[in-house]
Each structure stands twice: as structure tokens, then as C-alpha cells.
């Protein structure tokens, strides 16, 4: 990590003509009050019983798929390619079982509680990403997770970070930066990787800027975020 940060820092320094003010472009962090709120144990929200039964089956299907994937990984390690390939069909069947449970809930969405909907959107986004390679659909479902009034706070914060990563992967750098900034404002614990990601996002954003001034400002923000990542890594 430290070697990578040093390379990034050196590279970023070469891209700017002057060293920016130390705090320039660094994100606002969560307040002590917000961190306390996130870490305070609250009464767990409860899904409607019929929804909970379906979601449990979704979780069981994901567990099954995960076990099969691990078996497949071990078979590949042992160079048993034929047996490993056969696992693809089993994984596909397990995923299809989980997706079927979600699909059966969708016609009822409008009548469900907000918390119920948030969990359905969350698991659908997981299927979109992990098994279906449907990034636009995953983004759409994560946005719905964020927008639901009764979404669990920690799940909403997690969704901010995932949305940032997904938008960046789709070259929507403005949205990626915006969701990362939201994440920083709400995250109880910030690691160097998050600053590296924000720094990379600003570098990419700089390449899209038509104004030289805006491009330079984005590069300065990138430099400071990578430098902050190095500070945190060195402090460990």
C-alpha cells in the first residue's frame, strides 16, 4: 500500500504546477454526533413476515451459490477443469432460485413497507452485480436503497460507497465524486483506500474538464487526497 501511494503521490506531484493548501479538496468527514448516531444500537427494523420468508430463501440461495463457487475454486486449483466447469450450471440454478423469490415480490412493491422495499432493492442490486453483470440495473437499485425512507443507516452509507465505485466504472466521474463525498460525510471509519479512490476520481475528472483551471483544481484535489491516504497509511 505505502509503495503504491508513494508512486501515486510522485505521479500527482508531477501533474501540478504548485502544491495546494493542505486541506484543499479533502472531503468533509462525519461529525462526532453522526458517528455516535451510526454506532448507537437501535431497535432493529422488522420485515413483513411474508417478505421475510422470501428474503430468507434469497439468502439461502446466495449461500448455496457461494458454497458452489468455493467448490469450483478448489477444483480449478486442483486443475480439475471439467468438474469445475460443471459447477457453472449448479451456480446458475442456485442464483435463479434466489432471483425467482425476488421476482415474486416485485408486483407487491407499492404496497410493501419502506424497509421491506429497501431490502428487496439491496438483494436485487447484489444479484445484478455479482451474477448478472448488469451495472446500470445495479446502480438503479442502489439508488432506490438510498432513497427509501426506512433503509437501515449503515446499509445506506454502504450504498453511497458502492454507487461511487459503480459510477466511476461507468465513467460518470461527477456522480462518482459526489457519492464518495456523501460517504465521507457519513462513514464512521475512513481508511486510506477511500482517499485513494477519491484521488483517482479527481484525476479522471480532470481529464474531462474543458477548462484548464478546473482541470488543475481537480488535479490539486487528487494530490491532496492521495497525500492524505499516505498519511493515514504511515500512521498505522
Predicted feature residues:
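Generic helix N-cap/helix-start motif at coil->alpha-helix transitions
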Residues: 49-54, 113-122, 152-162, 175, ...
Amino acid at each position: 500500500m505505502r509503495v503504491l501511494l508513494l508512486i501515486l503521490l510522485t505521479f500527482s506531484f508531477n501533474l501540478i504546477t504548485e502544491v495546494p493548501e493542505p486541506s484543499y479538496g479533502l472531503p468533509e468527514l462525519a461529525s462526532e454526533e453522526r458517528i455516535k448516531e451510526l454506532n448507537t444500537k437501535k431497535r432493529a427494523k422488522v420485515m413483513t413476515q411474508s417478505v421475510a420468508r422470501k428474503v430468507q430463501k434469497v439468502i439461502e440461495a446466495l449461500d448455496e451459490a457461494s458454497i458452489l463457487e468455493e467448490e469450483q475454486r478448489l477444483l480449478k486449483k486442483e486443475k480439475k477443469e471439467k468438474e469445475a466447469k460443471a459447477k457453472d450450471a449448479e451456480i446458475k440454478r442456485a442464483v435463479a432460485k434466489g432471483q425467482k423469490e425476488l421476482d415474486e415480490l416485485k408486483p407487491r412493491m407499492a404496497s410493501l413497507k419502506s424497509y421491506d422495499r429497501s431490502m428487496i432493492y439491496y438483494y436485487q442490486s447484489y444479484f445484478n452485480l455479482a451474477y448478472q453483470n448488469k451495472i446500470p440495473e445495479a446502480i438503479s437499485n442502489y439508488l432506490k436503497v438510498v432513497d427509501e425512507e426506512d433503509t437501515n443507516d449503515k446499509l445506506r452509507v454502504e450504498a453511497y460507497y458502492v454507487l461511487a465505485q459503480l459510477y466511476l466504472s461507468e465513467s460518470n466521474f461527477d456522480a462518482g465524486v459526489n457519492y464518495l463525498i456523501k460517504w465521507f460525510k457519513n462513514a464512521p471509519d475512513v481508511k486510506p483506500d477511500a482517499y485513494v479512490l477519491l484521488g483517482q476520481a479527481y484525476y479522471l475528472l480532470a481529464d474531462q474538464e474543458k477548462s484548464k483551471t478546473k482541470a488543475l483544481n481537480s488535479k490539486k484535489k487528487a494530490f491532496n487526497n492521495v497525500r492524505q491516504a499516505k498519511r493515514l497509511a504511515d500512521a498505522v
